[in-house]
From Swiss-Prot:
InterPro entries given in the database record: Asp/Glu-ADT_sf_sub_c (IPR036113), GatC (IPR003837)
UniProt keyword Lyase present: no
Family designation: Belongs to the GatC family.
Entry superkingdom: Bacteria
Protein name, entry field: Aspartyl/glutamyl-tRNA(Asn/Gln) amidotransferase subunit C
The keyword Chloroplast is assigned to this record: no
GO MF annotation, one: asparaginyl-tRNA synthase (glutamine-hydrolyzing) activity
Catalytically driven reaction(s): L-glutamyl-tRNA(Gln) + L-glutamine + ATP + H2O = L-glutaminyl-tRNA(Gln) + L-glutamate + ADP + phosphate + H(+); L-aspartyl-tRNA(Asn) + L-glutamine + ATP + H2O = L-asparaginyl-tRNA(Asn) + L-glutamate + ADP + phosphate + 2 H(+)
Length: 99
């Protein structure tokens, strides 16, 4: 990727994320992006033909827990300290959309 494409990509992602980045932040993220892509290239060079895929590994330890309901707070307790609540829901300022 060229620097221009990387810069354009970072600016596009920032815009989609509603972020305003300074020029030096764009440069920093561009360098980090290059480092990540370079690392991925190195990973792609690794010979894994004799390595079992992860899904074939046998893991003896039980990694799932039983789904047992536990006590929780009521809706009223959850919103009692909220600055604003309406109809049992938190009221928060709009963060996306119109500027």
């Amino acid at each position: 990727m060229t620097n221009q494409i990387e810069k354009e990509l970072i600016e596009k992602v920032a815009k989609l994320s509603n972020l305003k980045l300074k020029e030096e932040e764009i440069e920093l993220f561009s360098n980090q992006f290059k480092d990540i892509l370079s690392f991925i290239d190195k990973l792609n060079e690794v010979d894994v033909k004799d390595t079992l895929p992860f899904y074939e590994l046998q893991i003896e330890e039980k990694s799932e827990r039983e789904d047992i309901p536990t006590g929780s707070i009521t809706n009223e307790e959850a919103i009692k300290n909220a600055p604003q609540a309406k109809g049992g829901f938190f009221v928060v300022p709009r963060v996306v959309g119109e500027e």
